[in-house]
Design a protein with these regions (language model features):
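Conserved alpha/beta-hydrolase "acid-adjacent" motif
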Residues: 197-203
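Catalytic histidine-centered segment of alpha/beta-hydrolase-like enzymes
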Residues: 221-234
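Conserved HGGG/HGGXW glycine-rich cap/lid loop of the alpha/beta-hydrolase fold
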Residues: 1-44
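Short beta-strand/loop motif that positions the catalytic acidic residue
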Residues: 184, 190-192, 196
């Protein structure tokens, strides 16, 4: 938990520990709340695989422990699915919703098969050399040509457990928000990179169109624009979370 201001609950991408988003959290004018899901970062793997609704309930329990009744909710990549599930499951606890580099789940405009194969295993977290070799292909944007940025990102990654990574893949299996997105009434900001091999841009347009109070911001970068366009992203999030705006 970092910062001051209204609370923002953040869900990270598959296999990614909470610490990867620390640069963003330090820039925002809100109190950021995040935690490692089972099998990721400092959390032990769950003995029983969990579905999205179970993880949303876990997040609600975290808020209960902190004494927080309502908050803004943000999800990045895989975490965007969990953010959508939380907003549907706990509409009265969700003030505003931010969906970054994400989609409606398994019913989506898919990436290329080669990208799907790269994402099917946690090898990029386990081998820095492998990550450097494939980063441009799967993340796009600056990672296609900025070797120094790729190596710096690799240095900050914490490998998930195999069980934890496979558990997150299982959580997403068969899950989609496409048919109930219209039920989410909270103001929603959809953020997307124009060169995202993992989540093609069409998915962001679908999210923004299906959400009754959704709008779309795009960034001239790839899947990790949250970090590579940090200053602009932080400004846009702060502006959106200013509850004086409509």
């Amino acid at each position: 938990m970092t910062g001051d201001g209204p609370p923002l609950l953040i869900f990270n991408g598959i296999g990614a520990s909470a610490g990867l988003l620390r640069p963003l959290m330090l820039r925002l004018n809100v109190t950021c709340i995040t935690f490692d899901l089972p099998g990721v970062g400092a959390s032990r793997p769950s003995l029983v695989p969990r579905r999205m609704r179970h993880l949303a309930r876990l997040a609600a329990q975290v808020l209960d422990t902190l004494g927080i009744r309502e908050c803004h909710v943000m999800g990045v990549s895989w975490g965007g699915g969990l953010a959508q599930q939380f907003a549907r499951q706990y509409p009265r606890r969700t003030q505003r919703l931010i969906l970054a580099a994400t989609s409606t789940g398994q019913v989506m405009v898919p990436p290329r098969p080669s990208v799907i194969l790269r994402m099917a295993t946690p090898l990029r977290y386990l081998s820095a050399g492998h990550f450097v070799n494939i980063a441009g292909e799967i993340y796009g944007g600056d990672f296609r040509h900025d070797a120094a940025r790729v190596k710096e990102h690799a240095r900050h990654m914490t490998p998930p457990s195999i069980t934890g990574y496979l558990g997150q893949l299982y959580t997403l299996t068969g899950w989609t928000s496409l048919f109930w997105l219209h039920e989410i009434k909270a103001p929603a900001l959809v953020m997307a990179g124009t060169d995202d091999p993992i989540i093609p841009m069409a998915n962001a347009r679908i999210l923004a169109q299906r959400l009754p109070n959704g709008r779309l911001n795009t960034y001239d970068c790839g899947h990790l624009f949250i970090l590579t366009r940090l200053d602009q992203v932080a400004r846009d999030i702060d502006a959106f979370l200013d509850t004086r705006t409509v």
